[in-house]
Amino acid sequence: MKQSIQLSVGGVFLASSLSLTSQVYGSGFALIENSASGMGQAFAGAAAVAEDPSTIYFNPAGMTYLDGSQLTAGLHIVRSKSEFNDKGSTDPFRGAIIGNNEGGNAGGTHYIPNFYYVTEFGEGKYRFGLGVNAPFGLGTEYDDGWMGRYTSTKSELQTVNINPAFAFKGTDRLSIGLGFSLQYIDATLESNINQTAFGAADASAKVTGDTWNLGYNGGIIYEYAPQSKLGFHYRSSINHELEGKVNYDGVLPALELIAGLVDKDASAGIDTPSAISASIA
């Protein structure tokens, strides 16, 4: 038996149903820590700057402005904070106050690496690049016994994006670039199961899944005046179909029979958002 779930990385990515949190810039669960140099200038003009190999991710056309072979790498450390504040929630069946354990700080420390390499070939007419980064991620983990444990106790989503790219100059002023993204995504969701009606301690459920899929990005840069560039970039959505398992622990035999709470295969659809950007530099 397989259980299917449809998820979306858009708007607010699972924020209510799975209690996941992240730094948000309009697409819900996207991470901005994809370039050390970009972070240093708040990504101003990212689609047109083309100052180092991280342009592979922001606009591969920018590789034509890099000479020889160049490499850049970064490691970003993110300390997230996520707290739940209750205002007197009650049990809908008994009317009693659920409790006062608000779960503490569900955030944590996360390490986000990136790596980019660009080299020229064809007597300097063409560029090839390879980028590896983590465009989506982070998660939550609440204290044991917290009042929302039947919704979520732990949630985690990690991605790895492998982005080879090619670029060339169409004219002296126009550069064109195209890249492909081989993207891996891994998700883990955990929650407790209420068995107090049967006089038993909580059981637990854990959903895991992962998958690989393909996307693409491309862009142009037009140098309309010396040292002045206009850039356009598009990155496609990637439609993931995670395959994994649902595992239960400590479930009473009666609930296994009545509610079907037995280990089974599971699938979940996660759609990452497309993005369009335009910059002047």
Regions found by a protein language model. Give the residues of each.
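Outer-membrane beta-barrel porins/channels
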Residues: Y25-A42, A46, F84, D91-E102, ...
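Short active-site-proximal "capping" loops at secondary-structure junctions
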Residues: G62-M63, I77-K81
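C-terminal segment of classical bacterial N-terminal signal peptides
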Residues: A15-V24
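Periplasmic N-terminal accessory/gating domains of Gram-negative outer-membrane beta-barrel systems
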Residues: A47, E51-A61
